[in-house]
């Protein structure tokens, strides 16, 4: 099979890159081995919440230029402010067009979102029913919050969230109540309702009668003007419309919080992007993974300074039938997604054996304290690339293999709150670079053809 672009990895970076390539008319394939980290995500888009030194960032876009000068090895420094802004705005527009509107504060500031543990986390874009608390919590206008769960649901504990919220001094005037709701639909299932996860409950709530029962129960515990916090139990596709329906029935203000995995807020993003990719004509190879790539030298006359070129891939499911493309993108994630692996004394990129930016001593990989405020150094390690995010193998640049997302080195997405921002921006940048190269190549071919005809 031949493509213009093959993207390895079906997470945020890979799908962002794939959608942009399809927009430009490129024949594109995505190879996804399984569930991405989006199944464990909040469903909000973090651009930059903290600097590596731990300083809080209030306005991420305005901070990017200074941030890039202070941390020149960070992916944002290589991308530049203009590219990051274009990428995030493009993503926001794209997701809105496919049914998942994302909004930020009008003044461009980060906002706080509520976590299932009752803490506040800084982010930049959130989905429609994720309540945006101001960064200055003393300006919070909500007077009463009602934390409500489904009876027996284990992945959201209102009492725990309530206790943690009461520890936030800026919210000392906020009245916080909790409640648990039971659904009669539990009587019709054969499983113990305490075993149900968010996906199971979302299936029950796909029936209008069950949603109406939920709406009535909510009205027994809250009044208009209250902020009603629910675990994310409404799936993709019709999930947002169900929430709007319940809000209209109850006249309550609803707030979704991500649950312990699986997170339907994150799944909503992934499934929406995958659906759009397939609808636009993309090829999705689910449940497959690349086992090796076939390379060639660009300049054999000077092996020491020669570049590599990736010609084709072999995957587990396709066996001896290779997948060929003009350009490739590696977006397989970090250790969590097995895009990187660690041995006793070294880290490896398991597909192509790419060069890794890592410390030689294993003792330098981690901090002495497990819960260190500075996090662990291994979280900032990843693939060595050029400034244009082209991969490097044995010291040689691979001209047509770009890297994007958590596999990149030089940043700590967990500490910084920059994971989604880097994923989207680097995926978008890879797509833009590929589009430019292929358009130049096609233009050159057309000019050569015209010249031959003229002769």
Swiss-Prot record:
InterPro entries: FAD-dep_OxRdtase_2_FAD-bd, FAD/NAD-bd_sf, G3P_DH_GlpB_su, Metab_Enz_Cyan_OpOx_G3PDH
EC number, as in UniProt: 1.1.5.3
Stated role: Conversion of glycerol 3-phosphate to dihydroxyacetone. Uses fumarate or nitrate as electron acceptor.
Subunit description: Composed of a catalytic GlpA/B dimer and of membrane bound GlpC.
Pfam (any one): FAD_binding_2
UniProt keyword terms in alphabetical order: Flavoprotein, FMN, Oxidoreductase
Pathway terms, separated by semicolons: Polyol metabolism; glycerol degradation via glycerol kinase pathway; glycerone phosphate from sn-glycerol 3-phosphate (anaerobic route): step 1/1
Cofactor entry: FMN
NCBIfam families xref list: glycerol3P_GlpB, PRK05329.1-2, PRK05329.1-3
Source lineage: Bacteria, Pseudomonadati, Pseudomonadota, Gammaproteobacteria, Vibrionales
GO term, biological process aspect, one: glycerol catabolic process
GO CC list: glycerol-3-phosphate dehydrogenase (FAD) complex
SUPFAM superfamilies in the record: FAD/NAD(P)-binding domain
Name of the protein this chain belongs to: Anaerobic glycerol-3-phosphate dehydrogenase subunit B
Gene3D superfamilies documented for this protein: FAD/NAD(P)-binding domain (3.50.50.60)
Entry GO MF terms: glycerol-3-phosphate dehydrogenase (quinone) activity
Family of this protein: Belongs to the anaerobic G-3-P dehydrogenase subunit B family.
Catalytic activities: a quinone + sn-glycerol 3-phosphate = dihydroxyacetone phosphate + a quinol
